[in-house]
Amino acid sequence: LVHGGDWMGYRERFGHDALDFSANVSPLGLPEGVAKAIREALSQADRYPDPLCRTLRQALSRAEGVPMEHILCGNGAADLIYRLVWAAKPRRALVTAPTFAEYAAALDTVGCEVERFTLREGNDFAPTDALCDAVDESIDLVFLCQPNNPTGQLADPALVEKLLCRCEACGAILAVDECFLDFLPDAEKWTAKPLLNSRNLVIFKAFTK
């Protein structure tokens, strides 16, 4: 099965369905609240959607406690990762290794040099202060997956704040991917949202990548 939900290709090849853990879909099916929202939206299906996503951004603003003008909506997190890279056009970027492969793939599209900070088994593959030391004036963009994919490890909030301060000092953007953070019962403890007054911080959240 190809990563990312090609269930039809799997069915055509093997004649049956598989449990696909590479796609963020629920085995419980479509929630009734979502089905209801779809039915209610059908009356406006003859119109183009609002390009500024005003209603959605207002709802997200209330739910997340973030000013509406700080929210940009896209077609999944991957879309926004590419948009950020295309807008910033970094010459050199820093990612952890291992991590979500889409960061490097997006950076490759603008010819960006990708520097990889290796997560060590001796630290249980968790990021350390050494990650901050890897940021210098040559780095334009830093990606941090919180929690990291595929290790599942979290960066301590104090470390994230220190990393952001380092990025600010060096003129780099810190992009924190929190797409899976809400799976944690204490997600609010780990989010970087309290740091959003910084112009150097971008947070990704999504229903799916």
What are these model-predicted stretches?
Residues 108, 125-138, 150-208:
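Active-site pre-lysine segment of PLP-dependent enzymes
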